[in-house]
From Swiss-Prot:
GO terms for biological process: DNA recombination; DNA repair. The keyword Zinc applies. PANTHER family: RECOMBINATION PROTEIN RECR (PTHR30446:SF0). Belongs to the RecR family. It comes from Burkholderia thailandensis (strain ATCC 700388 / DSM 13276 / CCUG 48851 / CIP 106301 / E264). Signal peptide: none annotated. InterPro entries: DNA_Rcmb_RecR, Rcmb_RecR, Rcmb_RecR_Znf, TOPRIM_dom, TOPRIM_RecR. Keywords: DNA damage, DNA recombination, DNA repair, Metal-binding, Zinc, Zinc-finger. One of its GO terms (molecular function) is DNA binding. A zinc finger (C4-type) spans 59-74. This is Recombination protein RecR. Residues 82-177 form the Toprim domain. The gene is recR.
Amino acid sequence: MSIKPPSALSELVEALRALPGVGPKSAQRIAYHLMQHDREGAERLGRSLLFATEHLRHCEKCNTFTEAQVCEVCCDPERDPTLLCVVETPADQIMLEQTMTYRGLYFVLMGRLSPLDGIGPKEIHFDRLVRRASDGIVKEVVLATNFTNEGEATAHYLGQTLKARGLAVTRLARGVPVGGELEYVDAGTIARAMLDRRTL
């Protein structure tokens, strides 16, 4: 007869498996570590997750995470409103900000096109992006999606649609490696890719 772990522990393992890159064994190791060695850390993690889910929302303008209706970047009068940079995730936005080479505004897709996974234009908030880019203020849209197959397909789809509306559309230069995700690329490489962006 095999021994089953307590249901509370099994639920914790299952919840941890929802995290990207965490499989069953990793989830089990994390759960046991938290319960054996870091209960205080586990409680802090639980409180932080609850606080984040209760207080974080999407910015009404750019779709990134914020605690207010409109994020700090969108409220910043020093930003250039004629430039709109499209990224896949808030983590990509933060990486671009760390380069200190871009002073425009953003739109965060919260994903990328992936028909096999059921992610189409609606899931990446395409209509909101088009409305934002077509506000009469934006002059250039910088496509900073990742250089993965899905990121390239997303950039192509967005580029074709936005160019048809008379907008100048540029793409980050290839300083970012093929298959590379912005979140994992150093700030210097991203800065060079932003400065050397090309017209689509």
